[in-house]
Amino acid sequence: KAVRFIPMFTLEEIEQYTIQNKKNFGTLKEAIYSRKIIDKNHLYSDTILGKKIWDNLLGDTPSKTNIYFSPEGIFHLLGIEYLCFDRPDCKIFRLSSTRRLCEDRGTASKPSLLLLGGLNYNDDSAVIQHPDTLPDRSASEILGRDMLPPVVGQGYTYLNGSLAEVNKIRTLISPNSCQLYQYSKGTEDIVKQDMQKYNMIHISTHGFCFDYQIVPSTLYLKDNVSEDLSLSRCGIILSGANRTAKQDANNKYVEDGILTARELCNLNLTHVELAVLSACQTGLGRITADGIAGLPRGLKKAGANAILVSLWDVNDHATQLLMTQFYRNLLKGKNKIESLHDAQTYVRNYEIEVETGVGKQQWKSRVRQEIDKTKEKSASPQTTKIKKYQDPYYWAAFFLIDAI
């Protein structure tokens, strides 16, 4: 069929779009860059925004159609596939490039999974010295200059939900097909080495991105080191990093425990069918004419196929629920998009029981009432079930790229 051009809006129009909510009025761009939970909830609940983006595109689309899109500009930082619009019958696939549709995707191999989680960032007992070479410590040098953790300050704290997450995922796959690293064992040396051995990678830890502005293409082309610096300001934290990242003479011959997007570029991940970075901000990066310069680009340059990353600081327990259900669906035979969609639905409907208050006081008995009217017995507390994670902040942070 002939290619069809559909005009939508200018960059300024969409960036300055006013988010619909009952109290505060902010723009789309402000909501995307905001770290407030309420702003994420308003953004992804705005039905007018969803229609503005999707209605013209999907108006003449047949039912149950697969939609493939490659984002541009600010849409790299917005999960437009999760916005409210009237075509739930369509499956939407985010691609790093539409040329992926023309590539031979081969056949899926038997799952082999590398799992990392429950890492101890203060324990560097398993870190290996490299006296004959100088390890790559560029990440700690850059973060040190910027006065950022874990080089400066208190460092990163232990994630209880991360340990539960990887332990539950481990039970879903054959022990012979899974390698789990916890506590002090998930060092940068081990991760770089073993990421190149498995076709599925799941890393549950802290993530960071300190550079996710949109750069005009004219400026970006003039700066040859812009991409390299951007890739060095996005990464994940591994075992012992609170100690090994310090600018100390004792750390001269050890990896700094910070795996950046730039370092990922140098690995061979062509065999990796799915890479999951279950951490905060792993889908962010500097936006340029070439796309997003962050962890997604590092993984794609290394050759990884589908990746699952996040747009903001995620909730520990909600992420644990999401990831566990995602793998449960995936290992039952569902495709990646269906597995994530069903996992998000599971999180949205996840219920907990909460106490609503103490019931009215009741007399123990009529006889007792006559004997001592001052003694009372409290009724059992009343409880109700609530959907704790139904807001978009809890389930819409993670998105798949190239899950085809």
Q: What do the predicted segments below correspond to?
A:
Residues 1-404:
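Catalytic cores of enzymes
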